[in-house]
Amino acid sequence: MGRMKDRNASAGPEVKPAGLSPSRFVKVFMHGEPFERKINLAIHNNYDSLSFTLKRLGNNYSMSPFELEGFVNNEEDGAIDNDFDLLYDDMNGVRYLLGEVPWEVFTITVKRIYIVPAEQQNESEYQEEEEDNAAAAATADEDVDGNHWWRNHLWSVGPILQ
């Protein structure tokens, strides 16, 4: 007797393109803080919205995740006037200022975001302090063989960056 295929069974897991995901969480590190936060890039359409949220987060980094939920452009809270520089690392570990590349490229390649006080003049001093955080986070991104998860997925980003 031959076996009939179940019409409802799928051939494999459904894969969504990275840009269409309903959520895209990225780790955010604040200079001098021992822990990181995560922010959902999917709720932001541009750098202005993201910068506004990150600067508010910089002022309120110790708030609980529940208090930060929905922490988007809310004009009722007033303008934010603070001195934070916003940096990020891409998948290759290259550090950029937020806004240096087109938004679409940023959303695909960003791996970590850093909120740094603007008075921090010596970037190498900052980088030494953040290496501990980055080393701890990098081990979380490796599989049991020590391979980075994104190395197998670079083909999906390549054509966009060219």
From Swiss-Prot:
Looking at the record, the residues that make up the PB1 domain are 23-118
One GO cellular component, as annotated = nucleus
Its BP terms in the Gene Ontology are: auxin-activated signaling pathway; regulation of DNA-templated transcription
Q: Which UniProt keywords apply?
A: Auxin signaling pathway, Nucleus, Repressor, Transcription, Transcription regulation
Q: Which SUPFAM superfamilies match?
A: CAD & PB1 domains
Sorted alphabetically, which PROSITE patterns does this protein's record hold? PB1 (PS51745)
Location in or out of the cell: Nucleus
Region (Disordered) residue ranges read 122-141
InterPro entries (UniProt xref): AUX/IAA_dom, AUX_IAA, PB1-like
Family the UniProt entry places it in = Belongs to the Aux/IAA family.
Q: Which PANTHER family match?
A: AUXIN-RESPONSIVE PROTEIN IAA17, AUXIN-RESPONSIVE PROTEIN IAA28-RELATED
The further comment given in this record reads: Lacks the EAR-like motif (domain I) which is conserved in the Aux/IAA family.
**The protein's assembly and partners:** Homodimers and heterodimers.
Q: What does this protein do?
A: Aux/IAA proteins are short-lived transcriptional factors that function as repressors of early auxin response genes at low auxin concentrations.
Name of the protein this chain belongs to: Putative auxin-responsive protein IAA28
| Biological source species | Oryza sativa subsp. japonica
